[in-house]
Amino acid sequence: MAVAMSMDANCPKNIFLLCRNTGIGFDDLRLHCIFCTKQLTTTELQAFALRELNVVWRRGAPYGACARCLLVEGIARRLKYWEYSYYVSGVEEETKQSIDTQQIRCYMCHKPLVKEEKDRHRNEKRRLHKISGHWRGSCQYCWSRCTVRIPR
């Protein structure tokens, strides 16, 4: 079911609030990708919700992002807006707070990192990256995807 809201309405920023405010069930919700305009599949909609990504509003209509465009945009943003990289201790020194209390997302899929993923960066001495003014790392899934060795 398509959704539209007036420009002065308080537009919900996440999928669950969008469903609640419009009375549309999650399974009936239809969003298009803000980048390529294709309709998100049910799986992409679920992933969008689980990654806690914000709904984007254009001309009174809500948009999400498909899996392919999220990956492409993540790579493009990293290449275009990378500022510098630090180990966990450097990030904590710069921000004056533990990474455990900071919102750090995966630079590939944009999922918020959980404590175990942040701990892995610390324990395995992997760098976090400052991209577009925000600290980014790798989630468990993207970490393994980026470290796969190609057999010779």
Curated annotation (Swiss-Prot):
It comes from the Viruses. It is found in: Host cytoplasm; Host nucleus. One of its GO terms (cellular component) is host cell cytoplasm. Its main location: host cell. Transmembrane segments: none annotated. Keywords: Activator, DNA-binding, Early protein, Host cytoplasm, Host nucleus, Host-virus interaction, Inhibition of host innate immune response by virus, Metal-binding, Modulation of host cell apoptosis by virus, Transcription, Transcription regulation, Viral immunoevasion, Zinc, Zinc-finger. GO terms for molecular function: DNA binding; zinc ion binding. InterPro entries: E6, E6_sf. A zinc finger (unnamed) spans 33-69, 106-142. One of its GO terms (biological process) is symbiont-mediated perturbation of host apoptosis. Belongs to the low risk human alphapapillomavirus family. The cancer-causing human papillomavirus E6 protein has a unique carboxy terminal PDZ domain containing substrate but low risk E6s do not possess this domain. Belongs to the papillomaviridae E6 protein family. Plays a major role in the induction and maintenance of cellular transformation. E6 associates with host UBE3A/E6-AP ubiquitin-protein ligase and modulates its activity. Sequesters tumor suppressor TP53 in the host cytoplasm and modulates its activity by interacting with host EP300 that results in the reduction of TP53 acetylation and activation. In turn, apoptosis induced by DNA damage is inhibited. E6 also protects host keratinocytes from apoptosis by mediating the degradation of host BAK1. May also inhibit host immune response. Forms homodimers. Interacts with ubiquitin-protein ligase UBE3A/E6-AP; this interaction stimulates UBE3A ubiquitin activity. Interacts with host TP53 and EP300; this interaction inhibits TP53 activity. This is Protein E6. It comes from Human papillomavirus 3. The gene is E6.
